[in-house]
Amino acid sequence: NSQKTFRVGFLPVTCHLTCPVTDWINKSMTGKGFFFPVRFSGWPELKEAFLADNLQATFILAPMAMALRQQGIPLKIVYLGHRDGTALMGHKDSDIHSFKDLKDKTIAVPNRFSNQRLIIYKGLKDNGMKLEDVKLLELPPPDMPAALQSKAVDAVTSGEPFMAQTEMDGYSRVLYQAKELWPNFISCVLAVHERVIQEQPEVVQQLVDGIARSGKWLDADIEHRMEASQDVAQQYYHQDPRLLRFVLSKPPDRVTYSNLMLAQKDFEEIEALALEAGILEGPIPFQEYTDTSFSEKTQGIEPYQWNPGK
């Protein structure tokens, strides 16, 4: 019954990959899943579905979850989605090679409340610049490759595999990987309605455990990543599998999924930048928007013991 009633939102980005991978592994191993993954194309639709109670949980931008809690939405962050897995891309024919070259240029970001926006803010700040020195344009990640190819924007940044798509198709180059600007970068988290935590804590724990196990499974063997790329891209993302294969292997640590327990210092760094950038209205206590009890129980959890190739 939980599969029918426990709906989890995700976007077709690698920041959310553990959501479909958990479902895929469980269905492959046991013939059934224990939650229903719901795919969205953009942040506005996903956010509205969560606020309308059409989702029990969702992968969501970390600053967006913090801001929603600040606005009175009863949610809790219970786990991380990933580490790293974001790049800033410029057109290969452009004269942009550093943040200094971005002055007066147009940069596409996924959302006002995205950590990609904070990466831009941090990079500008580290180079003695301000947000006002560039033009930020909000675009759904799937629309970014076409915008960069047509030179409608000068640079783009979002979760993968859309940055890799621009690289593979030959019209872009990497300006910066997220880890160069912000080591152990976090974009997205898993958020759950507080009511759901109170009413179905066992399903929330099962979900967090599954995500932890699938994340470690992905990081354990490059062949696991290649197998997941093929099936998840087709069945859940509706994308060319070569995109996920590229992102998950070149190099393998381009995005990682093992170190996903909640740590206060990570969110204090996000909060500090979000306050400076004007995303948050004011400070918000870590305990107010997180429930660390679920992630704490994943300490030492083993990856799924499954080899799809055998």
Regions found by a protein language model. Give the residues of each.
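Secondary-structure end/capping motifs
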Residues: 198-282
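Short, glycine-/small- and polar/acidic-enriched structural segments
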Residues: 1-130, 135-138, 154-160, 171-176, ...
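Amphipathic, soluble alpha/beta structural segments
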Residues: 60-67, 80-87, 231-234, 242-244, ...
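Hydrophobic alpha-helix position signal
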Residues: 68, 124, 166, 232-234, ...
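Short amphipathic alpha-helical segments at helix boundaries and their inter-helical linkers
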Residues: 150-153, 251-265, 296-304
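N-terminal hydrophobic or amphipathic helices and topogenic motifs
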Residues: 1-39, 268-310
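Extracytoplasmic/secreted proteins, especially bacterial periplasmic and envelope-associated proteins
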Residues: 20, 41, 45, 49, ...
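Pocket-lining segment of extracytoplasmic ligand-binding domains
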Residues: 63-64, 94, 137, 142-237
